[in-house]
């Protein structure tokens, strides 16, 4: 009985992940390009990386090098075959919204140039996005892999592990 319950819970979590759509929102990349989610993501796989606090940002940074090497710099032997939208999304909520312009400008000054197109600042209140995506803990980063139709096919949270990264890699055709 316990095993069948575990199987049911596992299958339910997979289906909810696959069935979920990303809510509509707009943003601007750190290199000033306007992006409309999910419309501008269709046609390619997309990895969206959300962080809504300093602590979450620290864990998100553990993902930067592997994601950068595989999908942005494409340094591996077979990495050229990957054509994936990558967006690191600092989620601003509450009083941080009033500092959005200064946060964005400071970020641009301190970020290497080839990462600027991959940093997306939301135009909407980040709290709504977090709520819609059921991202309840502000102290951990969240990662969503979207298929070519911009549907969520995988989600994870927390610091980088090879298992999480391999799961993402395996889902990208």
Label every model-predicted segment.
Residues 17-38, 62:
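N-terminal "domain-start" segment that seeds a small globular fold
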Residues 138-173:
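Thiol-/selenol-based redox modules, centered on thioredoxin-like
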Residues 40-64:
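Short active-site neighborhood of thiol/selenol oxidoreductases, capturing the structured segment around
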Residues 54-56, 92-96, 126-127, 152, ...:
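Solvent-exposed loop/turn segments at secondary-structure junctions
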Residues 4-14:
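Sec-dependent N-terminal signal peptides
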Residues 98-139:
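Thioredoxin-like thiol-disulfide oxidoreductase module
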Residues 56-112:
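Structural microenvironment flanking redox-active thiols in thiol-disulfide oxidoreductases
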């Amino acid at each position: 009985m316990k095993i069948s319950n575990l199987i049911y819970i596992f299958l339910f979590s997979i289906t909810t992940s696959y069935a979920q759509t990303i809510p509509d929102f707009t943003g601007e990349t750190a290199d000033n390009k306007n992006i409309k989610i999910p419309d501008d993501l269709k046609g390619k796989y997309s990895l969206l990386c959300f962080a809504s606090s300093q602590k979450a940002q620290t864990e998100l940074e553990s993902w930067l090098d592997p994601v950068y090497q595989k999908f942005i710099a494409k340094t591996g032997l077979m990495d050229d075959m990957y054509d994936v939208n990558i967006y690191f999304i600092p989620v601003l909520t509450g009083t941080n919204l009033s500092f959005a312009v200064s946060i964005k400008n400071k970020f641009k000054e301190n970020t290497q140039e080839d990462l600027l197109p991959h940093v997306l600042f939301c135009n909407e209140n980040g709290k709504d996005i977090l709520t819609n995506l059921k991202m309840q803990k502000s102290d951990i980063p969240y990662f969503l892999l979207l298929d070519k139709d911009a549907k969520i096919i995988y989600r994870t949270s927390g610091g980088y592990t090879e298992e999480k990264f391999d799961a993402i890699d395996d889902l990208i055709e």
